[in-house]
Amino acid sequence: MQTDADVPPCILLLEDLHESEMGNQVAGCDPARAAIALGALARLHASGWGDACPQMGHWFINGDIVPRLFHAQYRNNRRSFERFAAERLSEHGMAHVKAIRKTGLARITRLHDAAPRTILHGDFRLDNLFFAADGSLAAIIDWQTVNRGPGALDVAYFIAGSLPPETPEAVIDDLLSSYHGALVTAGVVDYPFERLLADYEEALLLLLHRMSGLDQLEFGDDRGVALMDTWFERFDARLQRVPL
């Protein structure tokens, strides 16, 4: 049995964010707020882009195993996930769910191998963001899934979970251009915009693997159910641009 004497001295440091507004993923956001968030994300990615990305670290997940982990999860949950997704995704979205059974691992492994590596937040979404009174991003929280991988994964994850499904793809392209411009401003000069567009579409497919475990989760209160339903609706809208 431990006593107070067995516990080493420690300090818990908390930032006071009471004057900031927490993002709300169920409510979503408009393109202007999304652009602010993506600008901050670009600066994070640029700080660890390519050769500057740490190769090892006890504080983040090894990105090399991520594709296989999520594909294994998909295979284990495939049948129940397909039933769950069939109630929430369009015919095009379901075609992708079924297609990744054969092609998914190769496509997401290729994305991880070919795209420049950076430090990924891993859960970059509105519920983990705080905004200041002037609209700027005040803080990003929940850093427990930090890993190495293509920056497009964080980008696709945020966009697919934040923007209303009726958002035109031209607006999505503008947001991607804004993110890319912030990367360039921060010093990333070897990543063409056309490459980002391609990586973004592949990243959406990887997110299908990631979402295949959602039907196993306990959603809790009404907000949890609303979050999942809204997330799938928005994600399905973004999948429409991705060819089979």
Predicted regions and their residues:
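Short beta-strand micro-motifs within the conserved protein kinase catalytic domain, predominantly
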Residues: M1-P8
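Conserved short submotifs of the Hanks-type protein kinase catalytic core
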Residues: P9-S20
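ATP-dependent phospho-/nucleotidyl transfer catalytic cores
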Residues: S20-H121, A133, L227-R241
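Hydrophobic HxD+1 residue recognition
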Residues: F124
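Catalytic-loop signature of eukaryotic-like protein kinases
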Residues: D127-F130
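Pre-DFG segment of protein kinase catalytic domains
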Residues: A139-D142
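Active-site activation/catalytic loop segments of kinase-like enzymes and analogous catalytic loops
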Residues: T145-G187, A203-A226
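All-alpha amphipathic helical-bundle segments outside canonical DNA-binding/catalytic cores
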Residues: V188-L204
